Amino acid sequence: MLQMPKLNEIPPGRGGPGEPWGEGRWAGPTGPEAARPARGARGQARGARARWDSWEHSRLPTHPGPGWDQCSPSFLCAPSSQKLIMESKDEVSDSDSGIILQSGPDSPVSPMKELTNAVRKQQRALEARLEACLEELRRLCLREAELTGTLPAEYPLKPGEKAPKVRRRIGAAYKLDEWALHREDPLSSLERQLALQLQITEAARRLCAEENLSRQARRQRKHAALQEEKKLRDLQRCLGDRRRNSEPPPTTVPSLGRELSASDDSSLSDGLLLEEEDSQAPKPPPESPAPPSRPLPPQSLEGLQPTGPESGGQERAPIQNSPWKETSLDHPYEKPRKSSELSSESSSPATTPQDQPNPSSLWVLDAASYHVVPIRNVPGQRQGRTSAPATPEMQGRRGQSQSLRVDSFRAGAEGRGRSAFPRRRPTHYTVTVPDSCFTPGKPPLPHPACHSCSEDSGSDVSSISHPTSPGSSSPDISFLRPLCLPEPPRHRGAWGPACGRELAPHYSKLLLPAGYFPTGRYVMVAEGHLPPGEWELCRAAVGAAYDEEGAPLRYQRLVPSHSRIVRTPSLKDSPAGRGLSKAAVSEELKWWHERARLRSSRPHSLDRQGAFRVRSLPPGRESFGRASGPRTQVPPVYVLRRSTDGAPVQVFVPENGEIISQV
């Protein structure tokens, strides 16, 4: 057995660094009396040791020995309330008990002390890092408080510390969206929950379908799958109810909005039929749209396949119903066109300036006998620009309703927007004009213009339609009654822009040449029975229509008109065309040959305001058309006063609002 030394004995090898190993180490008296002189002798031999009074207190020597400079104190003095941390490898002793301890590699307490020191060092590092993070958080919270004026709740407070008062910085005042910060859209929340529930339900089904399961596990998984499917159905039902409740009630405004978003290729008769259906029955919700009585025409040349009724409303038209912008004038004429451009090329955004009201308003004339004025489109129109033929209206809808579709009149720059109503591509039409337009006693009233929007409608003023006869796919035109306005100074005639294809009777049996109607953008406004040589070209702004009381004419029921536009491929197809005189036919042929002789190339686009190419003007009228090149534009002027010989003395330019007088 190992013999442990007694308390007051010095173990072997502990005699000090100056004592050699020998036989007499264990000999001699033992006890505190013998150990104390030995320790004193070792202290005197070293001379560099501090003199110890007790275990916890030490004093530096009053007279350091010669080896004091090379030695350093090996003990740390701590307060009496803390333990002494021993960091020296040398031996220490307790003067009271006589215990001699050594902190060396062979000591059993050394690994524990080292671990304690390492843990305490790591703790101090973590505390420093935490303090740095808290300081950064305080700084960020103070910056946020300077912007919002409110100290965030995340501001870290020390024990006993009060929250600082922060005032909002000048120039940082703004209002946060409380709804976006503290609330969320219930529909989006339900949609997210539904998407998550779909995944959970699918996972539960896969777990239930696994093989090699015990009967109890299979039963539990099947029950869980049924519960998830029930939650999924509840979410779907709740989402459907919320969507139905959030939609606005069906009114007449949504029906008009659907017509406004229709494509430019849709025909006017189709749009009017949809309007009548919407006025008779409320609009169903978008989730389950009711199919109309007949399908809509194709929205583009590419999609000639059957489409649903929502294709016109869901998909935007090739040309949106946006206000006209000046940047559209920068596009070149010979630009290669895509299919969407081909399908909406003839709808021009800037052909009907409505900047100010004008006496040349719309008219309604009583119907009587008629003269046939065949009007043709420009021969240079592309074949690919024609849309699908309009579907004839049903027989049962004849005479049910006559609607006047009038958008709100816009003034200023907003008056240049695109027409929000459907447009029809140019085709061959014959216009029947009542004889009441031409009273036998005096020339017609100023600017009696037939109003029709059956073709390219570039205006937001109005679109008038009446039920057509069987076999006719074109809507009727109506004539508005003339107003009791003072007659302006009479002039010989003027060309003016129309709301879509406006066709005016020139005189009783005159056939207009096709070159004077470039895709229905201009109209001859005649004031007397004048030969074509006396015609003049100018632009007259068409103002808002007014009724007899002077109020703007917006929505009213018109009396059934007996005049209409019918589709006629040639003159012989029209019954009234057979009675035309040979002189009228010869006049038309003469003008046709004149155009063919002087024609060099056809205009490619009429998207510019006033882009009307003047091929030939009568003698003496060349000043109105600036025929300076292949793209001559007619200046938009309105003749206010003339001299006795017929020369214009005072003209009005609607484009910039100037009145030009000749001195």
Swiss-Prot record:
InterPro entries: CCDC120/INAVA (IPR043447), CUPID (IPR021774). This is Innate immunity activator protein. It is found in: Nucleus; Cytoplasm. Residues 23-47, 259-272, 455-475 have a biased composition (Low complexity). Residues 349-361 have a biased composition (Polar residues). Keywords: Coiled coil, Cytoplasm, Immunity, Innate immunity, Nucleus. Residues 282-298 have a biased composition (Pro residues). It comes from Mus musculus (Mouse). Residues 1-73, 219-363, 375-405, 448-483 are annotated as: Disordered. A motif (Nuclear localization signal (NLS) 3) lies at residues 422-428. A motif (Nuclear localization signal (NLS) 1) lies at residues 164-170. Residues 50-59, 225-246, 327-340 have a biased composition (Basic and acidic residues). Disruption phenotype: After infection with Citrobacter rodentium, mutants show significantly increased bacterial loads at day 5 compared to wild-types. They are able to control the infection by day 12 post-infection, they exhibit significantly shortened colon length. They don't have impaired cytokine response. Mutants also exhibit impaired recovery from dextran sodium sulfate-induces colitis, they show increased body weight loss and reduced colon length. A motif (Nuclear localization signal (NLS) 2) lies at residues 332-338. Interacts with IRAK1, NOD2 and RIPK2; the interaction takes place upon PRR stimulation. Interacts with YWHAQ/14-3-3T; the interaction increases upon PRR stimulation and is required for cellular signaling pathway activation and cytokine secretion. Interacts (via N-terminal domain) with CYTH1 and CYTH2 (via their N-terminal domains). Interacts with FBXW11 and BTRC; associates with SCF E3 ubiquitin-protein ligase complexes.
